[in-house]
Amino acid sequence: MSIKQLSETLINQIAAGEVIERPASAAKELIENAIDAGASRIEIATAGGGKALLRITDNGCGMDGQDLALAVRRHCTSKLNESLMDIKSLGFRGEALPSIGSVARLTIASRRADSASAFQIAVEGGKVGEVRPAPGNPGTVVEVRDLFFATPARLKFLKTERAEAAAITEMVKRMAIAFPKIRFVLSGSDRSTLELPATGDDHLARIAQVLGPDFRDNAIALDAEREDVHLGGFAGVPTFNRGNSAHQYAFVNGRPVQDKLILSAIRGAYAETVPHGRYPVAVLALTVDPALVDVNVHPAKSDVRFRDPGLVRGLIVGAIRQSLTREGDRSSTAGAGAMLRAFRPGANGGFSEGAQAAANNSYAPAYGARPPQPSAWSVDTSPHRPLDDGQNRFDGLALPAARADAHVSPSQISEPVAMAMESGRFRLGAARAQVHANYIVAQTQDGLVIVDQHAAHERLVFEDMRKALSGRRLPSQGLLIPEIIGLPEEDCDRLMDHAENLDRLGLAIERFGPGAIAVRETPAMLGEVDVPGLVRQLADEIAEWETAGSLFARLEHVAATMACHGSVRSGRLLRVEEMNALLRKMEETPGSGQCNHGRPTYIELKLSDIERLFGRS
């Protein structure tokens, strides 16, 4: 069979198969054209999930009749000259319009601002019509009907109208975040409308429009630079997380991308701070010299290739971690919001259904719950006791031992602590009570804080262990009688393969015959610990990450497990000075707003919110 030149229509249909995968792909290409044209207002109308109709209206620079005729021809563009190494526009290939026109019914009407008349051209299944005069305002209107009518096999691979419409909405949100100075309006056939007014230079306001106002309250600003790469944007606190990665947005020179390198860097930055199966919320904006990034590696331009990927990844991981550390013990406000919603009075004047259920069960012990136990954790023996030179800060706090139903009257708080609370020096306030032998209630300058004592202390122990990891071996305590633990042979082998790493953490183990491990030393900072439970859990977790991760990451993972076993447990009564020592240590420790599993360690309620619940504001 002889080789022959393909027809222009077939060439465009092949290109459409790469560039236009679904209605959202077509909408993205057309919106990029509108942005490149300098539009400040873009309206998107859809019907049938974008399959029946896509109409993009903008107030950009527009085109005259000559440009319009060239725009529907393949590889005709005003955005590229001779080099692919200096691309500053979103589009540059000149493929979108001819590709769409080859598989749909395409109509374009456009008018330049300095022209008295508009022009129109139609393309149907690759057949290009003539340019004709037409009425119209300055700007461009692109209308796509019956997408893929010329390639009906493609229609079988599209999802439902609802799913395709959702994909268009998500794409518009990504574009809107990247360009806050542009007003976006999206309307569907079901009369639903997404309207995003322009926010100018206030990127966080635009992000809040898309992700909701909660993100504004839980966002940390990013501003870091390394060599020729700048990172801006916002990262959510670890406890503000979601069930999937759909709320992770990345932009390179204003271009929305879903790049694996960037998404991997986000995961690495939040390692050990977000629960398994949960995903942090982040909006990252990278500004790179165009010569240092290749945007022409994917047909849909959703991936990029950096000249120095290691530099970019290191910048992202380092900037996010430093920002999280700088925020210290900050935790998500979502927990407080959920609590307020639960206790908001219902229509009948009582509590809402969730609050009523909680009230009905407030004095009923949970199934299988242990009764309160005397504390085996003491401020005097804990590695997290106050420093000697700071002990005076807690003078006067030797109140009666807190019980599960204990409370502290205002007169019982010492004058130094009261003054510190008024000045705001103690951000987490002073302990008022311990309820259900699990939660510490503290009064702050402008509200109250509820602390999960186990989760908080677990984080403190972990941070101390992680800090010690960067230096010498962690201090250990020898066991008077070695603990012999029976394990499956494969678990014994795994533990012994990592015996050196465990020894750095203060856990000294050795073989004790077939199917057994002898533990001779445990980390000193853990105090009394369930050694068999700790070793068995370590064996299980080592089996999961045995072939992945760096040494330090593995050691951190082990440290997190050890911290959980060595922390003050739920159900233990604490003295008031112990509670306050825990609060002070939390204030000093970066990342103490969430435990090692990513759950919040405390919830803060502002006085204004509490007063609203009682109708006092």
UniProtKB/Swiss-Prot annotation:
InterPro entries attached to this UniProt entry: DNA_mismatch_repair_CS, DNA_mismatch_repair_MutL, DNA_mismatch_S5_2-like, HATPase_C_sf, MutL/Mlh/PMS, MutL/Mlh/Pms-like, MutL_C, MutL_C_dimsub
Alphabetical keyword list: DNA damage, DNA repair
Disulfide bonds: none
Region (Disordered): 363-394
Cited Gene3D superfamilies: 3.30.230.10, Histidine kinase-like ATPase, C-terminal domain, MutL, C-terminal domain, dimerisation subdomain, MutL, C-terminal domain, regulatory subdomain
Keyword Metal-binding in annotation: no
Gene Ontology molecular functions: ATP binding; ATP hydrolysis activity; ATP-dependent DNA damage sensor activity; mismatched DNA binding
Pfam families for the chain: DNA_mis_repair, HATPase_c_3, MutL_C
GO terms under cellular component: mismatch repair complex
GO-annotated biological processes: mismatch repair
Ranges of compositional bias, category Basic and acidic residues: 382-392
Family per similarity comment: Belongs to the DNA mismatch repair MutL/HexB family.
Function: This protein is involved in the repair of mismatches in DNA. It is required for dam-dependent methyl-directed DNA mismatch repair. May act as a 'molecular matchmaker', a protein that promotes the formation of a stable complex between two or more DNA-binding proteins in an ATP-dependent manner without itself being part of a final effector complex.
Name used for this protein in its record: DNA mismatch repair protein MutL
Source species: Allorhizobium ampelinum (strain ATCC BAA-846 / DSM 112012 / S4)
